[in-house]
Amino acid sequence: MNLSSVYVLASLAVVCLLVKETQAEYLCGSTLADVLSFVCGNRGYNSQPRRSVSKRAIDFISEQQAKDYMGAMPHIRRRRGLVEECCYNVCDYSQLESYCNPYSTAPATATPVRTTEPQPEEAEDDPLDGMVGDQAPLGSIENIENLVYHYDSDDITIDAAKMEPKKLKEILGSFEDKKANPVFPFIRQSKNIKPNKFPDSFAHQFPTDLVEEEPTNEIPESPSQKPTLERLGYKHNQTDKKEPTENNNNNNRARDNRTKSSTVEPHTVPDYISKQYTHKPLITLPRGTPRRIESRDSYHLTELR
């Protein structure tokens, strides 16, 4: 071997070392741990590298098998650890990846998702469907039985409202003011209790007394039957056939008649309601000055309206 061939071999050895240094790196301590964590990710790593089945089989062959195949016990290389291979020597990416644990082939357990079955829609028709605004009664048909109502244009029984909801709808739609006026929103009554009837059109603005009565089959009054003064306890003073003697007595008698005729016992109003409503007499008769009218038979004492 001449000198030139020695230089060529030496130069080739230097080039190989330089290439190896550029592709590998010495890794030790925390730097090695950080690089392995980056390469392996969530799999983690171990201190011994993963090897193929053939190499693992060679590692664990018995001495008799070695003698049979090769005639002598082969030299089995001791496994180097992670530090010995990457810190004392250099290791590349493929060597680092061999220390990572294998990927898990088991599928991830998915969290069961609860699904709600669609509920079937109710196909029942509401008997009060379509009654909107002021026409709609308060609550359901069951609540109508327990509420006290007063109607301006008509008076129907609660039983009819319960048994015939369509009839109630027709009646409510036929009113001029298009609504039913409840006497008080939540006054409940028994079956033998019914509200008093008011004589004038402003009666529905005030609460009523509940009067206990026996169940009867009487027919409700028609709207044409207007309340008269005789029904309200007013007794018209018959004309006095005797001629009054003194004007003072005539004035006193006329004042007494007006007081008796215009005095009506007001309805009892609870204390918690009287603070909210201003109670007024339900009937106010017009007042005027009496005058003397001369006729053929006698003098009549009347009142101006």
Curated annotation (Swiss-Prot):
It comes from the Eukaryota. It holds the Pfam family Insulin. GO terms for molecular function: hormone activity. One of its GO terms (biological process) is glucose metabolic process. Residues 1-22 form the signal peptide. Residues 107-130, 236-305 are annotated as: Disordered. Residues 119-128 have a biased composition (Acidic residues). Residues 52-76, 102-305 form a propeptide. It is found in: Secreted. Residues 115-305 are annotated as: E. Residues 102-114 are annotated as: D. GO terms for cellular component: extracellular region. Disulfide bonds join C28-C87, C40-C100, C86-C91. InterPro entries: Insulin, Insulin-like, Insulin-like_sf, Insulin_CS, Insulin_family. Its main location: secreted. Residues 107-118 have a biased composition (Low complexity). CDD domains: IlGF_insulin_like. Residues 236-245, 291-305 have a biased composition (Basic and acidic residues). This is Insulin-like peptide. The gene is ILP.
